[in-house]
């Protein structure tokens, strides 16, 4: 999967720091060496398999240099859940359909933030020219009601009220974001 990610990362032609969170015990030493070979100054952070799409990012964020301006948050998205807890799509449509859907979703998200050098430059210029721009992703969604119960549990932790459910969000947890947001 890292080969696919690097095909998109190659569209980043400006200097950047690469932080990679990997589930501890899930990846081989060969996998880790492949990442190190791609970018020798990579910072690899081993994390627990906890927090779904965002847990590894939150753990890795603690390692990010505070002088960082922008973060590009990526992850390998499959949309199939775990063997002991398959996604709703796997339960409804089966593994093959779910894997196809996951691939399509992943590539759509990646193209939204890294499709080519021109798109990357447009995104970076947007951040540079619009100080109110805090986040850029593939598409905005407003279907928070699907996860309403989980969101309501988290709202007090972040000082948010229930009106937060009516807001839009960047889907797929693949996005550019200002470090200080």
Residue ranges of predicted features:
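ER/Golgi luminal nucleotide-sugar-dependent glycosyltransferases, focusing on the catalytic module
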Residues: 1-181
């Amino acid at each position: 999967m890292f080969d696919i990610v690097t095909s998109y990362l190659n569209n980043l032609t400006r200097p950047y720091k690469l932080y990679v969170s990997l589930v501890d015990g899930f990846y081989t030493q060969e996998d880790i060496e492949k990442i190190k070979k791609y970018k020798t100054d990579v910072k690899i952070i081993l994390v627990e398999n906890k927090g779904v799409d965002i847990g590894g990012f939150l753990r890795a964020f603690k390692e990010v240099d505070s002088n960082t301006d922008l973060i590009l948050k990526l992850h390998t998205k499959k949309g199939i859940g775990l063997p002991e807890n398959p996604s709703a799509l796997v339960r409804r449509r089966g593994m093959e359909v779910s894997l196809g859907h996951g691939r399509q979703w992943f590539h759509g998200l990646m193209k939204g933030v890294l499709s080519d050098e021109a798109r990357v430059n447009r995104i970076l210029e947007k951040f540079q020219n619009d100080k109110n721009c805090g986040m850029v992703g593939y598409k905005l969604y407003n279907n928070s009601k699907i996860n309403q119960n989980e969101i309501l549990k988290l709202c007090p932790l972040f000082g948010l009220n229930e009106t937060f459910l009516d807001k839009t969000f960047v889907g797929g947890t693949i996005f550019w974001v200002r470090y200080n947001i």
